[in-house]
Every structure is written in structure tokens, then in C-alpha cells.
């Protein structure tokens, strides 16, 4: 079992503090949902864990199996088994999907450990079929001209190919219709097992109807203020964040 620990994490952007002391433990074998209103720091948390240089960690630790990874670059964190599926994936002209994924799978490996072309194609075909993706998607430039739904499927395809220890899934349900949501959820559920953990960031219960979390954490004002099981997400759907904030004595203003 691998453990990702976030201890008293404070993160600022351009001098403004966004995370104000986050404490969180993720374990392989578990799926945790991070829920909360807009602007509360959910995406900042995933970016800080992955090492985005635009986010300054001013205090705290991020430990992967007991080792503080704060001084590691993004690619080093990825090689240790961290994966981030972004809400708005970048387009990279000139590099095909297949080229990108094979390079990512072989990064940092000795020649004898690199996946062969044959094994790569076999695995790629299998995972694309699982997600209902056309074969031509493999030869298109990375995310270039992709629809929102295609980009999200492509992020999950990368997840299935790379098989990380921990996936940070930042609003993968954003902008998806119900059919695309089911496909994306199917891909995430395919990964579930004792060697995989996930942190799913979402505003809504809808995604969690298809990916049942083991744990639900509610973020407000840069902190985790409440934790529970899947029933907590259902409660949020009924009461909204205002009800939770009132119970906890937290000042909260609903968006108009």
C-alpha cells in the first residue's frame, strides 16, 4: 500500500493565500472525493500536489510513502506514480497521442524495461476500445481540435495506459453529457484496486453516482472542514454548501 499525506499545507498564488492548512491522507485502494464551492482551493490542491510552479507552497509537507516530494519537479513526481487529469488539457500540435503516451510510459526507464511497440499497440487498442474511442484518435495530435468530451476521454486513456499509484482528477465531469460521463466513469472504475488511489475533485453529486467514493472531504475557505463516507455527498446534494457551513459555523455566501 502507498500513502500520500498532505500535512498543514499552505499555498499562495501571487502572494494571495489559497490553501490555509490542508490536512489529508490518500491511500491506494481508496477513492476520495473533494467537494466544495468555487474558489475554495480544490484545484489549487491538485496543482500543488503535482508541483505546478505557479503555486507557492509556503508551509507544510506533501509526503509520498514518507518522502517529502516538495523539492521534486513535476516529471519526477509523475515517475513516482502521481497523475493529474486537468480540467482544461493543453493542445500540443506536432505530437500524436500515441507518441506522447509511449514516451510517457517509457520515461526514465532502462532500455530493457521499456514497453515494446507491439505491447504498446496491443494495450492502446484495448484501452481505447474500453472508452469507445475511434482508432484514428491515436494518430491525431495531442488534444488538437478535440471536443471537450474527447479531451476528457483522452485524459482517462492516459490514466489507463500509465497506471499511476495516485490519480488527481480535477473536475473530469465538467461539460460532459451523460453518455460521456458514463464512459469516463467506466475508465476510472476500471483502475480501481489495491494498487490505485484517486482524488476526485467535483462540485456535484452527479459524477459520484457512477464512481462511488470511499471517502468524501468538503473544502471551504482553503481548508477541509468535514469528512465522511459517500453519504456525505448525498447530504450535500440535498442541503447544499450553505447548510453544511451553517452547521459548522462557517461564513459562506452562495453564488448568485
From Swiss-Prot:
CDD domains: ABC_FeS_Assembly
Coiled-coil features, chain-numbered ranges: none
Keywords for the protein's UniProt record, in alphabetical order: ATP-binding, Cell membrane, Membrane, Nucleotide-binding, Transport
Its membrane topology: Peripheral membrane protein
Family: Belongs to the ABC transporter superfamily. Ycf16 family.
PANTHER family hit by this protein: ABC TRANSPORTER I FAMILY MEMBER 6, CHLOROPLASTIC
Protein name: Probable ABC transporter ATP-binding protein M6_Spy0273
